[in-house]
Every structure is written in C-alpha cells, then in structure tokens.
Amino acid sequence: DINKPSIIYWSIGNEDPLTSLHMVSVKLVKALDPTRPVLLPWRPEEWLPKEVDILAPHYWNPQEYDRLAGHSGRPVISTEYTHAYGNDAFGGLEARWKALTKHPAGAGAAVWMWADQGVKTPVRKKEKDLSEDEYLRINTAGWDGIVDSYRNFTRDYWETKAVYAPVYPAVDKISFVPGQDSVRIPIQNDFDFTNLSSVKMAWSVREDENVLYSGTDSMYGYPHTVSDFKLPVEKLVTVRPGRTYYVWFIFTDEKGTEITRRAVELCPQTEQLISVPVCRELLVTEADQVTIEAGDVRYVFSPKNGQLVSAELKGKQLIKDLYPAIWRKLNQGETSGFGKENLRKAVDLTHYTSSVTAWKVEKTPTNAVIRTTVDYRVDQENRFTVTYRYSIGVDGRLNVYYQILTKVAVPWLPIVGMSMQSVSGLDQVHWLGLGPYDAYPNKQAAPILGVWGGTAGSPDVTGIKAMRWMERSGSEGTIHVSNSGYMENDAMCPERTYILSGVFGRPEKGRRAEES
C-alpha cells in the first residue's frame, strides 16, 4: 500500500456484549501475534480479563475520560469519539482529547470518522431539506467525515489538526511592560520521542492587522515537557491605545510540513487612554421619531418599536435598522442538537408583533440616553421582552445595552444578540478576533487571533466568528462595532450582520455541548 499503514493493535468486534466467543477470539489473536495489544471497542470496564490489553470507551464526556485515564492501570484508547456528523457540529473535541491525554494512560483516540461514506452526488429533487448544500453524501448517516468523499477538507478537518498538534504555546496571553527586552512564552512539546530542536518556529509580532517585526527560531525541549521561548519585545517601546498586540507562531517539522499555527496575545501592563474627537453640541429632537445629532453623526429612533431605524454620517445613511435576534433557520448540527421533540415545538421567532411598554429620553450636557422596554409576541406559547438602553455621547458613539428575557417553547436558541442591516455600499467586512474559521464556545482550536475579512456574503466572511470588533466599509463610509462575543454575516442577505452575545454550542451527533 502506498500509504504504508502500520498495525498498532488488534480490534475484536465492535460495540458488542462480552461473550465467550469474544474471549476465544482475543486469545486466538494473541496466539497468532503476541507482539501487539488487543482491545474490544466500546468496552472500558476495568474488570475486563487481563488478556484485554487496552480499555476502549466510546463517546464519553471529558469528565469520564479524565476519571478513567487518571487511575487506569491499562492504556486507554477511545476507538470512537467526537462524531463528525454533518458539517456544522463536531463540538467538544479539544476538551475530550485534553482530558484523556493529560494522563499517562491516555494513549489516544479516533474521531468518527475520516471520510464521508459515499460519493458526493448532485441532488436535483430533495425529499428532505438537509442543508443548503446542493450535494448529498448518500444520506445524513453517511455525511460524517472530516473530509468529504473526494477528500476535500471540511471545517472539522482543521479542528482535528489543531487539536492533535503536538507542539503549541501553553498559554493564550502573556503580559509585558513596554520597553522590556523579552517575554518568556512556554511551548508545550507533546511528542513522545521528538525534541523541539527539530521543530522550526516562524513568529511575527503584530498590532491589529499590521506585522511589526518577525523572525525564525528553534529551541531545545524534551518530549512531554514545557520549554520557554524568549520572544524579543524591545521594539514595543510604546503601545497605541485601542490596539491589540499579539504574536503568531507557525510550527513546522524537519521536512517543512506545518504542524500548527497559534497566536498568543501580548497584554501591555500600562494604562491605555483612548482619545476620541468631541463635538461641541449634542442635539436631541423629539417628534414622531427621536433624532440625536452629535456633530456629523445622526441617529434616528422610533418610539413605536423602540429601535434604531437609521444611523447617518455626514448626511449619508450607513445603518438601516437594529433589532433583537434570537432565531434564524437552524443548520444541520443545530437540528441534531435540538432533537426531534423540540423541533416539533419550534416556531419562527422572527415573526412577531412588537409593543413598546416603556419609553424615556434623557439628556445631559455630555450624553443622551434612551431607555425603553419592548414586548415581542409570536403566539400564545412564544414571546420575549427586551430592555434597551441607548447611550450617545458628545463624541458621536452609540452604546447599546440590552437584556432579553424569553418565554418560548424550545429550551435553547441558536443565537442571542442584535441584527444590524447596513446599506448596500458597505460590502467589505473585517473583524479582529478568531479566524478564518468559524468559532463556537466549544469549537475554536483551529481559528486563531488576528484581523480577518473579505466581501460580505462570501465564504471568507459568512458563518459564526468570534469577534472583539468588526467593521463594514465601502464607498459610503465605515461602521465600527465593538463586541466581546460573536458575529454572523448572512449569505442570503449580505447587508445583514448579527452582533451576538451568545451562540448555541456545537453538538456532537445529537449530544449537546453540555452533554458531551
């Protein structure tokens, strides 16, 4: 075989009850090949006969892997875990892998599975709307590889590669004082036999989207140890307020093949005072609509629905609306996580009737504040209430605070946040956060910190992205939004961006994030 496969262990049966036939098979295999261990897939019991060399649990949660591997006298290999069902799930891989392999007994695990179990075939008339994909891999039961049937990489492939990387920074962020010579960044070596001296590190220190300086290094580090890399930071004498500083690492092996790439945030230990332009007057006009002007910036709010209906800069409209978002069409992974019973109860929570129950406008010399409460009624079983506080300062910045209280038939929501529609001319989207891949609370090993972007509605931008700030820009101007959460650009409506405080964690073939 051109791939030169190696037999690591012999596997007897699959997810079977333990019978005398299995033990006869185990003893026969060990007699034929006494050099390799034997396991029974799905059997993790510590009372198994001594002829079973390896314990092999399936689809456990991180706490269960931690408990077993922490005291097991036999190696533990999870011969199936983290089912790659669909292209929108695969949550929790990193937590399970680390819980298992942090112990000496945690010998490894195998995701289910490598490749989709079917040829990628066009479907002209779908009986079921399984996804937005025009192709189908046999059916949903065969749509479970980290690569498709043609070996094209999926998002899950990159997550697996990042989680399994044997070399990586042991921290996500580290502090420094501007002007100091260097900082020590711990590098973890999870190789069994390879010293870090054979691994090359290409690094670059960055300020937002800009590379400040870079270098290439190697270091000495024994297997299964942490060694410090001395990163020079003497060039970071001053830091600019409002900017994010971080270092990118790209690790490659002795053949030049990339192992992984990671980012470590560099946090300056100094007070950063952000100066903003201040206009001379804050003008508030109350009529059928409330208009608040601060210099060249103009905001328009509607007392009828409690929402921002327009934002303008120098007479040009940039934002057309801003309203709460707790629902959208569920993707394949989300439907598996919600389950059939909850899907039967689910309704489209975007179709509602709103009524304003409280509205108050306050003005001081330095800011204007609108406080409002709005009830949104879908039907008798589904409604929600949003309390808003819009605050606009003399610098023209709008701060939006909101609290969403729901009473709906389903126990979970796919998204929670605000939906913002910009004008069509703002077709470029950039964000500081994790990219370029989608990121979720329990699935964010592959994306790394940086500034990412592309054309609105394109594959570079669509999907759930972890963000700190995002910008929409174009011929009409620029919108800058700060948010420590997530964003989602709508491929069907590129002008719409969801600014989110929470998203539904990725399930793992029906097992929700909290269950797996």
Feature names for model-found ranges:
Residues L236-I274:
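Terminal connector regions
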Residues D1-P186, D190-S197, A202, E207-N210:
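Extended substrate-binding grooves/exosites of carbohydrate-active enzymes
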Residues E209-R243:
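Intrinsically disordered, low-complexity Pro/Gly/Ser/Thr-rich segments with frequent PxxP/GP/PP motifs
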Residues I187-F191, V205, V233, F251, ...:
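Hydrophobic beta-strand positions in extracellular immunoglobulin-like domains
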Residues V237-G242, Q269-S516:
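Beta-strand/loop-rich accessory regions of lumenal/periplasmic or secreted enzymes
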Residues D190-N195, K255, V408-A409:
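Short, acidic/polar linear motifs in exposed loop/turn regions
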